[in-house]
Amino acid sequence: MLGTVIKKIVGTKNDREVKRYRKIVAQINQLEESFHKLSDDDLSGKTSEFRDRLAKGESLESILPEAFAVVREGSSRVMGMRHFDVQLIGGMVLNEGKIAEMRTGEGKTLVATLAVYLNALSSKGVHVVTVNDYLAKRDANWMRPLYEFLDMSVGVVFSGQDRDEKKAAYLCDITYGTNNEFGFDYLRDNMVFRLEDRVQRDLHFSVVDEVDSILIDEARTPLIISGAVEDSSEQYRKINQLAPLLVKQEDTDEEGSVGHYVFDESQRSIELTEDGHSFVEEWLVEQGMLAEGESLYAAGNLSLLHHVHACLKAHVIFKKNIDYVVQGDQIVIVDEHTGRTMAGRRWSEGIHQAVEAKEGVTIQAESQTLASTTFQNYFRLYEKLSGMTGTADTEAFEFQQIYGLSVIVIPTNRQVQRKDFNDLIYMSTEDKFEAIVLDIEEIVNQGRPVLVGTASIEYSELLSNYLVKKGVKHNVLNAKQHEREAEIVADAGRPGAVTIATNMAGRGTDIVLGGNLQVELAKLGENASEDEINALKADWKARNESVLAAGGLHIIGTERHESRRIDNQLRGRAGRQGDVGSSRFYLSLEDNLMRIFMSDRIKKMMMALGMEKGEAIEHKMVSNAIEKAQRKVEGRNFDIRKQLLEYDDVANDQRQVIYRQRFDMMVSEDLSEAISAMREEVVTSLVDEFIPPQSIFDMWDLEGLEEKARNEFGLELPVAKWVEEDKKLYEEPLRQKILDTFVNDYQAKEEIAGEQPFRAFEKQVLLQVLDTLWKEHLQTMDMLRQGIHLRGYAQKNPKQEYKRESFELFQGLLEQIKYEVIQIITRVKVQSAEEAEKIEAARRLQEEKTTMNMIHDSLDSLSDGGSDSADGQEYPKVGRNEPCPCGSGKKYKQCHGSLV
């Protein structure tokens, strides 16, 4: 109570921040008139003036008012759009590396231009991040005229671009792209062998659109570049037959409960019971996949166990038309937050292969991780990070904790007039959908458009069937119809339009009341007459006014999402820029959120009220209880994301060390000093193994040392002979003599090859060894991560154990890199340029002969009475119709003559 009173007197922290920004807005407004008088050339010339001032030491903050005034004036001239005062505040929030929460329709794309322009003045590059390629290209093309007018270059990165195009896009002042593309380019840059093949510059400043979707919803999805490994598709196909035989254990609390697996729906986790293990082992023995008497948990059978778990998850957890769709011969993942399909994305840990087996499509090979990171760790690499969204305040704590980003709620330009009605809760899904259809019919009869948000493709199609039966015209926007997205959204605001859409997050398009005039004008084409354009504008104005008079857009939610933010995003589609509108959520006790987290309590309440089929309960107390359940789920999801980050932070520290070393190797022209240091460490380690430090002669294993040097390094070290010849050759002098032998071998090779070629060879060896061992290390880390939770059963802290073991693994990796580099350089046989040319010429000649033999063999196998294959001897000159001298029995022109 006291806190509320103080807030009313002093204002919230957000209010105080907005008040501070308004003082700077006043300065920008004072400059407006003088900037309005400037010519186009003088206005665009301000960019080079600002750059000069920054180069002389002025700060961005000192030129902010002028820079924002320039962008506002430029936008008015080029695009016919003037930034509102609240949009200027949004630009300041972004410039300070914070998150601007702005309601739908408040012009986030235009707001970004302010901070983007200001930070691009440093010529270090600014990245504008969107959720998909379509929005990246759309926003770049939309804002390009403004930026180019202000003498700024604009580029777009997208999947499928060649390296030169991508590099050029990154060299622009402003680069648009998706979070995936920026992240994957970062990983790819750390896999190239030449500095000139890198495409990204240092990560300077980033503005993330739909920041909650990218930094929170997708935070659990790692970015992985992978390569194929050994094919195990047949195992998935066989084990897929097992999954339908397994029975869920219904009540885990009762003793004697029967079942093969326990499924925790709230955690989306699944575990085999004791009965389940026995059943699976018996079945695998019957199928000949497991030896009699062997355990599924034996070290050699962990791959089988992995396949069993993956197939069980595919059948129980992953649902068709909810988690994925089948398109042709492929399984395509559906983004649970946006309802979009994610072509090219695959689940890891064998899940995707198991789903492919379940649906009977071609099973693609499993993959090995070559490089990986998370969005959390990638975006924390930027010097300055900011973001925009319509709904961030509910996740403000997480943004602050994980990314150090404050959330500032930007006041709306006009007062929100949307009415948010209490939820209606029904006993069953059927009752709920019947009520939704009645509501839709009533709203449509009033001449208002309706947007219905569903959580899955399955629900959108179910509701569509209800509406078809009632004869209600409607459009469905889900992962299966995403090609028509722009067209459907453009018409969604027309009078009486009904649009069913899976989660509207990240759609990037506002629903304009009366229909989207700009889209309709574009359809008319460039050749449209003035009369046609005016007629269309008049028609749109009449439609817009009729929808406003009827009450605006009505939003219907078919169930509550786990996150309040997603619900708020759906609601926010109505009431844009002060328009009227309304929203209501329809729930049933069979909805996932209700069923998993709170149905028993509400069910008892509904029974106590004597509710019957078709009746609903509507009460603020119920809506509050649901919100409380959502907070609980959000808290759980935050813990999961935080835990993921804590584990990935360990890997990230290692990743940064490896990537830093890799970069240093690429920029260095001479790595001989590094090689020398490695050689000394490796030789010391080698000698210590057979001649322990400060030991007596009897403890020395000279024979073992000679053998290892010969087998591992290809060097003859007559250590026993040296000791025999020189009785005073003690440990240290002997150690030095062995090192000198390695050094002499190295110098001899360098002299033969030439200094420059040998330096290039060293660099190549270092990079290749580092990459190969890093990939193996990632795989080991993955395996460690997957099984580390089992340490909890031994009363050990899994997180601490993971940190300890991963550190040990990393130390081992660094030692192994040194060892293998020295091993390769010492074992390599070096020829002079002349010798190399002779060997290459001989190789080419042999290759030509081999090719001839291979082709001859393949032709010979098709003939009826072929003889032995040719031995590659030279043949005398023969006529084309004469028998081939190889002895095949064919004419020369049909045999070896066909190759000439």
From Swiss-Prot:
- What Pfam families does the record tag this protein with? P-loop_SecA, SEC-C, SecA_DEAD, SecA_PP_bind, SecA_SW
Q: Which InterPro entries match?
A: Helicase_ATP-bd (IPR014001), Helicase_C-like (IPR001650), P-loop_NTPase (IPR027417), SEC_C_motif (IPR004027), SecA (IPR000185), SecA_CS (IPR020937), SecA_DEAD (IPR011115), SecA_motor_DEAD (IPR014018)
Taking the first listed entry, what is the main subcellular location of this protein, grouped into a coarse class? membrane
Enzyme kind, highest EC tier: translocase
Where is it located? Cell inner membrane; Cytoplasm
User: What reactions does this protein catalyze?
Assistant: ATP + H2O + cellular proteinSide 1 = ADP + phosphate + cellular proteinSide 2
Biased-composition ranges for Low complexity?
Answer: 860-872
Stated EC number for the protein is: 7.4.2.8
Q: How does this chain sit within the bilayer?
A: Peripheral membrane protein
Cofactor: how bound: May bind 1 zinc ion per subunit.
**What GO molecular functions are on record for this protein?**
ATP binding; metal ion binding; protein-exporting ATPase activity
Subunit and interaction comment: Monomer and homodimer. Part of the essential Sec protein translocation apparatus which comprises SecA, SecYEG and auxiliary proteins SecDF-YajC and YidC.
Q: What does this protein do?
A: Part of the Sec protein translocase complex. Interacts with the SecYEG preprotein conducting channel. Has a central role in coupling the hydrolysis of ATP to the transfer of proteins into and across the cell membrane, serving both as a receptor for the preprotein-SecB complex and as an ATP-driven molecular motor driving the stepwise translocation of polypeptide chains across the membrane.
Q: Which family does it belong to?
A: Belongs to the SecA family.
What protein is this chain from? Answer: Protein translocase subunit SecA
* Underlying gene: secA
